[in-house]
UniProtKB/Swiss-Prot annotation:
GO CC annotations on file: cytoplasm
Top-rank taxon, per record: Bacteria
The entry's keywords: Chaperone, Cytoplasm, Nickel insertion
UniProt name for this protein: Urease accessory protein UreD 1
Coiled-coil residue spans: none
Family: Belongs to the UreD family.
Molecular function per GO: nickel cation binding
Database matches in Pfam families: UreD
Subcellular localization, as worded in the UniProt entry: Cytoplasm
Subunit (UniProt): UreD, UreF and UreG form a complex that acts as a GTP-hydrolysis-dependent molecular chaperone, activating the urease apoprotein by helping to assemble the nickel containing metallocenter of UreC. The UreE protein probably delivers the nickel.
Main location: cytoplasm
Length: 263
């Protein structure tokens, strides 16, 4: 009997030769694919693709990435990730395993859960002593135009970023049937959520506008994390804040919208 669920894998290895970054190995199976990388200064921009209408409940996804010393990579999804339901409320199970010894920026962009869908995501990032890592992801709580906000079963996401010791641990758990997005202390009715991290120090700030809430704070290791809830404008504001942080870091500007419709 052929399983109706799909197992997808992606393995990527980046190395540096003569000051330039090269994609040394790319293995894909199932719905995950990559396009050819684009040059970005001394580094590369690589788009991740998911074939088909989205990830179906019961599907299993595993992405493994190794960025060797000296390599510089921007990794992003070409389009938003759609989480679709399956019989029996099986979740999409996604595992992200990154070993970073060089420089990696990871932008999965927007995840959109459809009604009755569920997502179980785990991301583990191992950082070398000279590594630089940044990450930003966004969630829409459903398709707003169809009135589907908060109609999914659950989203459970665990993030662990560590070196010799844990640097950053985060747990996101949204259960609309128990605590909906309008419940006090949850999302206050806001339909978008954005979160991010980078392993260098930024100036903390917090802003509250008619569009929502957005802020940057520091961990005990002086690394930076970003959180925001609000409407679509808050996600765009988060990207602007991140663009400013990259400029302060001395990183060359990159138009991520050129490579991804998920942001």
């Amino acid at each position: 009997m052929v399983s109706q669920f799909l197992v997808s894998q992606l393995e990527l290895e980046f190395i540096a030769i003569g000051g330039r970054t090269h994609l040394r190995r790319a293995y894909s199976r199932g719905a995950l694919k990559v396009l050819r990388p684009f040059p970005y200064g001394e580094g590369l921009v690589l788009q991740l693709l998911t074939l088909g209408p989205g990830l179906m409940g019961g599907d299993q996804v595993e992405i493994r990435v190794h960025v060797a010393p000296g390599a510089k990579v921007i990794l992003l999804n070409q389009s938003a990730t759609k989480v679709l339901p399956a019989r029996g409320y099986r979740p999409v199970v996604q595992r992200l395993l990154f070993r970073v010894e060089g420089f990696l920026e990871y932008y999965p962009g927007l995840t959109i859960p459809h009604p009755a869908s569920a997502l179980d995501q785990r991301m583990e990032v191992s950082l070398g002593t000279e590594a630089s890592f940044s990450w930003m992801e966004m969630y829409a709580l459903g398709r707003l135009a169809r009135g589907e906000v908060g109609k999914f079963k659950w989203i459970r996401a665990r993030t662990a970023i560590f070196g010799q010791v844990p640097f950053y641990m985060d747990a996101l758990e949204l259960l609309p049937e128990e605590l909906g997005p309008n419940h006090p202390g949850v999302l206050e009715g806001h339909p978008y959520l954005v979160c991010g991290f980078w392993n260098w120090e930024s100036h903390p700030f917090f802003e509250e506008t008619e569009n929502g809430l957005l802020g940057v704070g520091l961990t005990a290791f002086r690394h930076s994390f970003l959180r925001g809830i609000g409407n679509k404008e808050v996600t765009q504001r988060a990207l602007k804040i991140w663009s400013q942080e990259r400029a302060l870091r001395g990183l060359p500007a990159v138009d991520v919208m050129r490579y991804s419709s998920a942001l």
